[in-house]
Amino acid sequence: MKLKFYKLPLITTAFSFVFLTACSTPQSSFFLPAQTTISTLKINGMENKTGYFLETQRSRGSYNPTASLTMIKLGDEKEFKNVDTTKQDEVLFANIYGGISSLLNFRIIQPMLTYWNLVNNSLSQIGSTNDLITFKDSGYKDQLAKALANNLIVADEGNNNFWFGLKALKFDTVKLQANNTATSSTRASTTQNTNNKIDAREKITINGNGGTNNDQNATVQKLIGIENIEVEFSFVKTGFNGNEIKFEDYVTDSSPTTSLLKQVWKSKWNTELTHTSFKFKLNSFNVLLTYQLEANQKSQYLPNGFSFLFPSNLEGKIDSSKSYWNNLVDFSKRTTNEENTMLLTDLQKKQDQVNRFVGFIGQNHFTLSANSINEKQFNDASTADFFKAIFQKVSINE
C-alpha cells in the first residue's frame, strides 16, 4: 500500500494526544506535531457498512464538527477523504458517529488513562478493592501498569522509541426508546415515532403545517445507546523529527519491531515484556442527540448536538426509571413519556457527578492523588462508582 503523510498544524494544549484506530495496523503513517489529537474508529452501522472516522484539531469538551479537520473512509474506499457535504450518508456518518467517538475519547478514555497514569498502584486499587478487574497473570497487570504510567518509552533521541496508547476502539449503536419532548416548544413532533423507537441513522421530518404545527423554534431530543464497546491498548513505534512525532506500525507479537521493543523494555525495567497488547470491554452508555428546529419549516434534520449520559448499567443506582431499563431488554415494549422523563432526570443527575469528576481530573492532572478523590466531592459518585460505570467486570488472563 502506498503510504500517505499528513502534516497538521500544532495544537497548543496541556493534554497529551490520544491516537485511536480500529485497524490491525495503521492504514497510513502520520507525521503529527506534538499535542495533536487523532481519532479513528471502526463502526457497525449504516446498513452494516464499515466506516472509519479521523478527526484532528478537536478541542476538549463538546463536539464541534465545524472546528475540526474531519476525514472519513467508508465501505471499500482505500483512503481517507474529506466529507462530501452534498451526500447525506457522509454528513450523517461524520456528525453522528464522529460525535460519539469524540465523546468516548474525551469523556471516558482520556480520563481513565489520566487517572491510571497518575495514581500510584491504581490498577491494584481498582482491581482488588472494587473486585472489578481480576488479573490471573500478575505479569500482565504489572506490565500494563508500567506501560500506562510511562506511555512514551524513550530509548534514545533517534527513532527507537515506543508510544503506548489506545489502538482499537469498536462499538455498535443500537435502537432505544425515543424521547420526543421538545424543550423549547411542546408543539414540535416527529413523523417517525409510531413505535417510539429510533435508530442512530434516523433523520426526523418536521412539518410546519397542520395538527403538529410548530410555530416556535424548538429542540427535539432522541436517546440512543452505545453497546459492545471494545478497546485495545498497544505499542506503536515512534520517532522524532524536530518537534514532530512520527507514528509507524503498531507492535504485534510477530512484527519486525517486537524484539526492539522488548530490548528497550528490559533495559528500562530489567524485566521481560510478554504482552504487546491489552484488551478490555467497556460498559454500554447512552447519548442524547439534540435537533434544533426552525419554526414553520418542513425539512429533514440531522442531529446537531450531543450529550454524553452516564453509562446505562451502573449497578444499584437506578431508582425512578426501573421499568424503562427493563424495557431496553425487550424492544417490543413501549415506554411512557413519564418514564422517559424520569430516565433522563436520573441519568442527568449522575452525569453531573461524572462531569465534576472528569473536570477535576482535567484541571488537576499534574497533582492528582487517590486521597484527593472522595465521595464528598462527588456526592454519591465515588472513584469506585466511576470505574464500575466504565468497565465491565472482567477476568484477564492473556
Swiss-Prot record:
Q: Which GO terms describe its cellular component?
A: plasma membrane
Protein's UniProt name: Uncharacterized lipoprotein MG095
Q: Which organism is it from?
A: Mycoplasma genitalium (strain ATCC 33530 / DSM 19775 / NCTC 10195 / G37)
The record places the lipid (S-diacylglycerol cysteine) at 23
Where would you find this protein in the cell? Cell membrane
The record gives the membrane topology as: Lipid-anchor
Keywords from the UniProt entry: Cell membrane, Lipoprotein, Membrane, Palmitate, Signal
Q: Which residues form a coiled coil?
A: none
